[in-house]
Amino acid sequence: MKIIQTAVEFAPFIKAGGLGDAVYGLSKALSESHDVEVLLPFFPLITPSFSSQVIDEKVFSYEFLGRQHAHSISYSYEGMILTIIKLDSQLDLFSTSTIYTEDDTLRFSAFSAAAAAYIGELDHVDIVHMHDWHMGLLSGLLKEPNRPHYPKRIFTIHNFSYRGYCSTQLLGTSGISDFGLSNYQLYRDPQMSVLLKGALYCSDYITTVSPTYAQEILNDYSDYEMHDAIMARRHVFCGILNGIDEQIWNPETDASLAVNYSKDLLDAPDVLFTKKEENKNALYEKLGLSYEYSPLMCIISRIVEQKGPEFMKAAILHAMENGYALVIVGTCYDPEIQRKFTNLQESLTTSPNIRIILDYNDPLARLVYGAADMICIPSHFEPCGLTQLIGMRYGTVPLVRSTGGLADTVVTGINGFTFSQTDNFNDFLHMLTLAITTYRQEPDIWFQLVEEGMLRSSGLTTMAIHYLGVYNSLL
């Protein structure tokens, strides 16, 4: 089967969040038994310094704001083809130093138009799998009646809150027909279009990244036209849980840990916990924390509204009052949140048990996973979430809000602790207290939580099998 995956992120070369990990992970898993090609826009951030062979180059034209040209370079990479498409410099859309800007609907629609032209020149494609609203226009362009062939179109919603609102006139410059364009237009304002809306109507099948998040999307009434669109397509919509690359996320081989360990040590829990304690000591020494504070809770997250920054602050106070350690590692994108957390960071510089690191540092984050006893994820909503899966892999018990993929993967008393979907701080603080008390007073129960998490299979194979089931149902 010839499968094309297309997105604007692909770990490790261009990544801002979980999207890059998910696209890489799925592509890698599928490439073990199928012909997989990944299409990415060129960014200055992408530096193909990897030792991959250039296997093809093309120059081709496409329609978007007039006749444009693009240059594609295809590399052989980890059993798949990685094709980077550089748009004509006349538009100068991808010379930015960041993945995302204020002109993203323009930039990613132009890339979608170029990707459609590139795919049209290929001899045969069975499946085109498009990821998130950025690729929304591509679905409509691939459905146009003048296409030389019609690959089946799969679209995955990674975050339903981001939809790609833009002008209808802009999309019309891609050469899409009036009928195709109507799938994107808003009824309430035909001069405006939504990339995600059009993708829902134009794709053969739609997925999202967890079963519970799929139900939450169906119950989302924040925009009645988007609700109508997803309800009209609910018979070809499902949630497939993301996985993690268990080779990349492996405490047995992770070079960032002070001491390695594995689930094989579950037969010798004292040895397992001793090794985690050694990682904890290494982290405490690195961050200047006092060894007397235990357990260690961590938060590894983007610090944005979605992730519940007000609950993170509540966790800081709870840690101070209850004598345990808390380490927060994350990046802020909102200036106001950045200001507040920078002030918190500075005020806690000499704290014996709290540290805030406002910079995502992968080796440090990995050491935190290996050192921590528990990981807290208080997100207001979480389409899937990967940090709870990584945490369990490293023997770190997740404490989460019961929403989206967190609800699908964490069960109180089985492999972690949960609190309700309401914004009730008492529920959240009760969860924290229960977790701390269990750790301190019920070591046998705590070990069972760790064991269940470490034995859980969260790899890529299961995710790939589910997607192959969708692909095969369409062919």
UniProtKB/Swiss-Prot annotation:
Enzyme class, spelled out: transferase
Keywords per UniProt: Glycogen biosynthesis, Glycosyltransferase, Transferase
Single GO molecular function: alpha-1,4-glucan glucosyltransferase (ADP-glucose donor) activity
EC number annotated for this UniProt entry: 2.4.1.21
Residue pairs linked by disulfide bridges in the UniProt entry: none
Binding residue positions for ADP-alpha-D-glucose: K15
Lineage top rank: taxon: Bacteria
PANTHER family reported for this sequence: GLYCOGEN SYNTHASE 2-RELATED, PTHR46083
Entry's family note: Belongs to the glycosyltransferase 1 family. Bacterial/plant glycogen synthase subfamily.
Protein name from the UniProt record: Glycogen synthase
